[in-house]
Amino acid sequence: MGEYTLVCPCSGKTVPDHYTLNCDCGSLIRTEYAARQLTLRNLPGMWKFYDWLPASGHTDTPGTTVTYRSEGLAKELGIDLHVAFNGYWPELGADMKTCSFKELEAPPTIVRAKEHGGKAMVLASAGNTARAFSYLSTITGFPLIVVVPKQNIDRLWIPGREPGASVKLISVGGGCDYTDAINLSNRIAALPGMMPEGGAKNVARRDGMGTVMLDAAVTMKGMPDDYFQAIGSGTGGIAAWEASMRLRADGRFGSKLPRLHLAQNLPFVPMLNAWKEGRREIIPERDMPDAKKSIAEMYSDVLSNRTPPYGVGGGVFDAMKATDGLMYGITREEAVAAKKLFEAREGIDILPPAAVAVAALVQASEKGLLEGRKVVLNVTGGGQERLMKEVPIYQVEPVLEVPGPDVPMEEILKVIA
């Protein structure tokens, strides 16, 4: 198994693992694995990185990142580029049928929850995370209660099979967004027998996403100089940083941490606003005034989070500082153009968040920031348009629609009991 201890990054103290999500100082707990060097295992999909995943068992799921050297986009931009592709692309060997790298979070998180005696998991999502966890719940039968804003429930589908009875979808209407869904999910998670998924605080989620960097480094035989990703909460950026530190300690993949290039989608860019002013703290009235209106205007609203793990110890701010990172604000027009460019040069469709990352890559290359450097672009989701033509999909229907996060718990209990 991936033998590990949990450690507070600020105090260095070991934290007992009871599906622990918090330490005393509020920092993001990290895993320290007994295996200091990475050994690839003969296991399905992402589980080849078993030694650096916080679980004893594994799932029989094929989803994993596939990293390849770009030709078309690399030539267009004049850079040395590898693409870490997460999605559905059979010719490439990419078989992530929910078409999002959230499928890297769900398997270790659900396995970890089961191993710690969890009876049911509760999570909130704007779409992609809910889809990945619902898929894994359907495969494993592990009970899942997922809370999603009403305008996003069309994103909640299962590839290749009917949704399992283990999945209970609650839709939050009334103009509610992802943060409202989080607030309701937190209330449900406080009920007896319920286990919160944990978001960025859950080491299984972060270490699952961190396998993107592991796959890139193994494929390239060394860590990249630069790493590009679009962010909503920023958890993927944190995960890439943490994985890089493990690779550095391994000793075979280089000693310099990759520079993080993290992109937010205008007009909702609270982390970018705080970062530009050198602040660890996000000031809501300054960094995200009229947040719901801004979120409604985004090209990719899954990249919205009003309470991201930015200033917390071991969070986005620390990751950016440690890697001399850069942050970008991408417009709708830039993202749309980047999506067309990638698809024309690489030959596969990509989801809107990935297009935001491509747009940041274009900006950086045009500024000459990537000359003579080895670059990784994390395509966090792709191949969905193709999958829809080749694989039957089944919509997950809500068991309950509520007007907002303050709904009486009696209504919730009727449908989740």
From Swiss-Prot:
Keyword presence, Cell division: no
UniProt-listed GO biological process terms: coenzyme M biosynthetic process; D-serine biosynthetic process
Pathway: Cofactor biosynthesis; coenzyme M biosynthesis
Classification via InterPro entries: Cysteate_synthase, TrpB-like_PALP, TrpB-like_PALP_sf
S-S bonds: none
Signal peptide range in chain numbering: none
Pfam families: PALP
Gene3D superfamilies: 3.40.50.1100
Keywords attached to this entry: Coenzyme M biosynthesis, Pyridoxal phosphate, Transferase
Catalytic activity from the UniProt record: O-phospho-L-serine + sulfite + H(+) = L-cysteate + phosphate
Record-level Gene Ontology MF annotations: ATP binding; cysteate synthase activity; L-serine ammonia-lyase activity; magnesium ion binding; pyridoxal phosphate binding; serine racemase activity; threonine racemase activity
Binding sites annotated in the UniProt record for pyridoxal 5'-phosphate: N128, T380
Residues annotated as transmembrane: none
Subunit and interaction comment: Homotrimer.
HAMAP family in the cross-refs: Cya_synthase
Family affiliation: Belongs to the threonine synthase family. Cysteate synthase subfamily.
Name of the protein in its database record: Cysteate synthase
Organism name: Methanocella arvoryzae (strain DSM 22066 / NBRC 105507 / MRE50)
